[in-house]
Amino acid sequence: MRNRWKTGVILASAAAFTVFAFAQTARPKPDVAHGKLVFDDNCADCHYRDSKDEKVGPGLEGIKNGTLPSGRKATHDRILDIVNNGPAEMTSFQNRLTEQEKEDVVAYVMTL
């Protein structure tokens, strides 16, 4: 009886973990064209897309070559973290954009 109970708990825990793990890894498929619109509406006031010159924030030209204006490696997760949390002087877009909009703008920024 005790072994059945332990087996049931282990199986239920494994099933819950599997469902949670798959739910956490699913990202919306990015739409670069929509990301350009999101950028125009939310980012273009502070960032040039076609220059490395500073506006309010740094210009973003050249990110497609793999480097952020800070000199750090340009990765999806790093750019998403900047969108969500930004440096201290940048507005956070964590609660201003949907997950889809964030994925779209990250995909677009990675083409600059």
Language-model segment annotations:
Residues 1-31, 82, 109-112:
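Post-cleavage N-terminal segment of exported redox proteins
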Residues 23, 48, 67, 90-93:
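Conserved short-loop catalytic and cofactor-binding motifs
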Residues 29-36, 48-81:
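Gly/Gly-Pro-rich "capping" loops immediately C-terminal to redox-active cysteine motifs
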Residues 35, 39-49, 105, 109:
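The canonical Cys-X-X-Cys-His
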Residues 54-65, 82-112:
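Axial heme c-ligation environment in periplasmic c-type cytochrome domains
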